[in-house]
Every structure is written in C-alpha cells, then in structure tokens.
UniProtKB/Swiss-Prot annotation:
It comes from Ovis aries. This is Prostaglandin F2-alpha receptor. Pfam families: 7tm_1. The keyword Oxidoreductase does not apply. It is a multi-pass membrane protein. Receptor for prostaglandin F2-alpha (PGF2-alpha). The activity of this receptor is mediated by G proteins which activate a phosphatidylinositol-calcium second messenger system. Initiates luteolysis in the corpus luteum. One of its GO terms (molecular function) is prostaglandin F receptor activity. PROSITE patterns: G_PROTEIN_RECEP_F1_1, G_PROTEIN_RECEP_F1_2. The lineage of its organism: Eukaryota, Metazoa, Chordata, Craniata, Vertebrata.
Length: 362
C-alpha cells in the first residue's frame, strides 16, 4: 500500500509556531544566553547571601518586613533567571526545533508560565516594598500597630498566588502559550490576534505591570519628599544627612531602573493587544524590549542591596574631594546598608505612647 496519500499526525507545537520570523535572533549564539543567565544568577546569589547575613545580624521587628520582601524579590529573580535561562539555552542548543523536542507543547507552556510569573511577581513585590516603606516613613505608628510581620507574609503570599493565577489564566481558559516568531521564547499569542480573549491576556499583563510601576513611583515619590523634609528639619545631625541622602538615591535608582527596563515591553504588549501595531512589524522591537525587561532582574540586586553600601560611600568621598571640600568623618557609612536604609522606621518598634512623645518633641 502506498504511503504517499497517508495523513501524517500534526504536532501541537507546529500549530503554535508563529507565521512570522525574526532576523535579529539569527546573529545571536547560545553563548549570549549562557553569559546572560550566568550574570543574573551570580548577581542575585550575591544579593541573597548579603540579605541572609543581614537577617542574621538584625532581627528587629522593624527590619523584618523589608528583609522578607527584599529576599522574596531576589529569590524570584534568581529562579526566573535559572528556569527561563535554562530553557532558553536548551532551545538554542536544540537549534530552535520546537516540533522535534516539544511535540506535546508542555515545555512551551512551562516557559510561558515562568515568563509571565517572573515578569509580574518582581513588579508586584517592588510596589509592595514601596507601599510598606512609604507607610513606615509617613505613618510610623500605624505601621507598628497594623502592619506586622504576619501581615507582610500574608501580603507576600497573596502577591505570589495572584501572579501564579495570572500566569495560569491561558491554561485555565484552554488556551496555549504560543512560540514567538524568534522561536526562542513563549508568551501570549501576539501574532494575528482575532479573539478577544487573546487580547485580554496581553492587556491584562500590560495593565498589571504598568499599575505596579505607577504605584511604586507614587509611593517612592511620597517617601522621598518626606525624607527630604526630615532632612531639612535635622540639619544639625550629619548622620541624618547621610542616611536621608542614601535613601533618596536608593528610591531614585529603584524607580529609574524599573521604569526604564519594563515600560517599553509593557507598552509594546499593550499596543499589540489594542491592535495599535502589528507584531509582524515590531518583532525585532519586541525582542529588544524583552531583553531590556530581563535586565531588570540583573540590576535589582545591585540597586536594592549593593549600590547603597559600596558605591554611594565611595561616590560621596570622591565627590567632596573633587569639589575641594574637606571630607567629614564617614563612620556613619560604615554601618550596614540595610541598617541605614531601615533606620527611618525604627520608631515603629517603640510603644505608642513613646512614639507620640518623640513626635511631639520633634
């Protein structure tokens, strides 16, 4: 019997391959993905080690919330780089032949879920840290009486579960994550969108990401203004100067890195979801914005942890020397960066009556 007319089974992966292609990925090798993944893992591993050491040294109540959220952030970034990077390296090593190594579309679904979760969860955690820090600075009594470590853990769990829920929405709706045009990553359907549900997923992802950035921006701005006001009221304390200067720079760094890295990708996804631009015409741009977003996971540990302790101290000394100003004693900068950054919330550990007395005296 002739086999020329026999029908060959169609792999699910072949139906999920994009009809368009990206030429930008042609010039990249597997070495780029390996280096990129390694840098991210090492950066976040160093941040985790610093946080663990700081947590062992400082176990006060007013510091536990920040340490818990910061640890969750860098751990999320760590596993995001580890899982997504490993899958990307495997895809490159397999010559991007999805039909061969992922006939059942299981790997693409896992890749897409991890991409969405590792994208939204750090943004949610960043906004949660901004809210907690804003309340601790502006309302220390309320922060002490209403926001406990137990509450922070509950909010952290809620944020993680919500990010998982958003990542699982396509699977729950019997939709599949789609292999993108470059054939190196999986995400929501971005090519030839005709169904409202596919648009909903893209718009929901973009809206939640931009909302998290907006909340972080507003809360960090309020915190920064409050710190500047405190600085101007305590000019006689050099320790206050150094501490508030450090906090303002930290907040500016957090806002700038998050907005610069994530805004282009989120806006691109929103534009595709609203049919403002065609994915065929923006494939290379989408890949570029995706890489910008992944850089946020590398820069997070340096902004949140390392930048405050090492760079600001050296920059402070060098700037004053270059300006010809006598360098004052910098014993304050020798303290832990975590201790300095959180000292503004130290009042939250005091009894309510003592807090009221301190606030009245100031």
């Amino acid at each position: 019997m002739s086999t020329n007319n026999s029908v060959q089974p169609v792999s699910p992966a072949s139906e999920l391959l994009s009809n368009t292609t990206c030429q930008l990925e042609e010039d990249l090798s597997i070495s780029f993905s390996i280096i990129f993944m390694t840098v991210g893992i090492l950066s976040n591993s160093l941040a985790i080690a610093i946080l663990m050491k700081a947590y062992q040294r400082f176990r006060q109540k007013y510091k536990s919330s920040f340490l818990l959220l910061a640890s969750a952030l860098v751990i999320t970034d760590f596993f995001g780089h580890l899982i997504n990077g490993t899958i990307a390296v495997f895809v490159y090593a397999s010559d991007k032949d999805w039909i061969y190594f992922d006939k059942s579309n299981i790997l693409c679904s896992i890749f897409g879920i991890c991409m969405v979760f590792s994208g939204l969860c750090p943004l949610f955690l960043g906004s949660l840290m901004a809210i907690e820090r804003c309340i601790g600075v502006t309302k220390p009594i309320f922060h002490s009486t209403k926001i406990t470590t137990k509450h922070v853990k509950m909010m952290l769990s809620g944020v993680c579960f919500f990010a998982v829920f958003v990542a699982l929405l396509p699977i729950l709706g019997h939709r599949d994550y789609k292999i993108q045009a470059s054939r190196t990553w999986c995400f929501y359907k971005t090519d030839q969108i005709k169904d409202w549900e596919d648009r909903f997923y893209l718009l929901l992802f973009a809206f939640l990401g931009l909302l998290a950035l907006g909340i972080s921006f507003v809360c960090n701005a309020i915190t920064g203004i409050s710190l500047l006001k405190v600085k101007f009221r305590s000019q006689q304390h050099r320790q206050g100067r150094s501490h508030h200067f450090e906090m303002v720079i930290q907040l500016l760094g957090i806002m700038c890195v998050s907005c610069i890295c994530w805004s282009p990708f989120l806006v691109t996804m929103a534009s595709i979801g609203m049919n403002i631009q065609d994915f065929k015409d923006s494939c290379e741009r989408t890949l570029f914005t995706l890489r910008m977003a992944t850089w946020n996971q590398i820069l997070d540990p340096w902004v949140y942890i390392l930048l405050r302790k090492a760079v600001l101290r050296n920059l402070y000394v060098c700037t004053r020397r270059c300006c010809g100003v006598h360098v004052i004693s910098l014993h304050v900068w020798e303290l832990s960066s975590i201790k300095n950054s959180l000292k503004v919330a130290a009042i939250s550990d005091l009894p309510v009556t003592e807090k009221v007395t301190q606030q009245t005296s100031t």
